[in-house]
Amino acid sequence: SIAAYWYRKAAEQGNARAQYNLANRYKKGEGVTQDYSLAFYWYQKAAKQGHEMAQYNLGRCYMEGKGVEKDVEEAKAWISRSAKKGYDKAIEYKKKQGW
C-alpha cells in the first residue's frame, strides 16, 4: 500500500514513529503480507530509540514468541521500560502478570 511505502521510507531513515507504524502493519497484515519477524525487527528499531509503545509491543513479541524466540526475561525488561515511561497498556500488563 502507499501508506506502507511511506512508512518504510521514513522507517529506513530512522524515524521511530514510522518504524512503530510499519511494525504494526506487519503484525496485522495491513497493506503488507503479515510477517511477525519483520514486525519484531521494526518494533526493536523503534524501541531502542525509546518509543514506549514499541517497547511494549516488543516485549509482547518476546512474551508470545512472535517473530522471535520466546524470552520472558526480555519481555519483562521491555515492558517495564515502557511502563516506566507511563504507557498505560504496559502498566496494566505488568499488574496483570503480577510483576
Would you name each region that the model predicts?
Residues 7, 12-15, 28-30, 35, ...:
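Short helix-capping/linker turns of helical repeat alpha-solenoids
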Residues 9-12, 21, 45, 57:
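Asparagine/serine/threonine-enriched low-complexity, disordered tracts
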Residues 20, 41, 56, 76-77, ...:
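TPR/TPR-like alpha-solenoid signature
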Residues 21-28, 57-64, 93-99:
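Hydrophobic face of amphipathic alpha-helices that form TPR/SEL1-like repeat modules
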